[in-house]
């Protein structure tokens, strides 16, 4: 059990930013063992999974971050970007709609919508080719 989750998160983020990804991952997991729904640890670990080539695994952590705190626009941006990365058009569209429902509807989300549409169009073209 962690005595100071904030200090542990700060340490994990420092390792992450320094490029020490394995240490950062271990620190995020330590936080998540103590508090499985910690939104920032889930978000950052989800991003780390994606960076390490496991974006599909990262999605589950990004979802937990959003479920815990849907008001953070960055969480929505991260999951939509990751879903686009793994070419999951349907879930990216669903996430975008949910983000809009909770009030996230600025220019970044318009660009994400355009990226989803571009991916949908390219998938349709490749399926008909």
Language-model-derived ranges and their functions:
Residues 2-6, 11-30, 51-64, 86-98, ...:
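Structural signature of tandem alpha-helical TPR/SEL1-like repeats
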Residues 41, 75, 108-109:
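TPR alpha-solenoid repeat register
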Residues 34, 68, 101-102:
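Structural marker of alpha-solenoid helical repeat scaffolds
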Residues 81-108, 114:
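TPR/TPR-like (Sel1-like) alpha-helical repeat modules
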Residues 48, 82, 115-123:
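TPR/TPR-like alpha-solenoid repeats
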Residues 44, 78, 111-115:
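Canonical tetratricopeptide repeat
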